[in-house]
Amino acid sequence: MKSSKNNNNEVLDLSFKYLVNYLVSQSIDVLVIGTNAGWKQNINIGKRNNQNFTNIPFYKFKNKLAYLCEEAGIEVVEQEESYTSKSSFLDNDPIPTHPKSVNISFSGERTCRGLYKSKNKTINADVNGSLNILKKYLISNAAWNGNIFSDLVEVCSTPRKVTVCFD
């Protein structure tokens, strides 16, 4: 019988392989990963959740993914991700960087776990945050424009179901 740690590593390895193969098949040459310094420090999500969450080896996860991507010719970049979960991507809210220098009101909010409500639409909160991380990266590289925004809004408004089989 496999240990839980080995089983988790096997699932992660298969997930990485699937992700890297998908990126290659779609001709994606840059993977943007959000980072937030000290994000696992001093969290307060309950004693049991703190123990479970802070035990997840995200640094190891990120390094392994970066290694496999770079092996496949995909550049991996890290993007500071403060305020990406609070800002509405669909409403094109500005995204301040940490520490926030001015008061900004955001047009949307998390309505419940996993959902973000903008002015007119509801979107998965993780998708909203991910799109904002990408937006921050593109803005910092002077590559953000209205065409990219409208394309991404169209893509995230028509989700696809992906099934991954683990043998």
Language model segments and positions:
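Positively charged, helix-rich recognition surfaces that bind polyanionic ligands
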Residues: 1-167
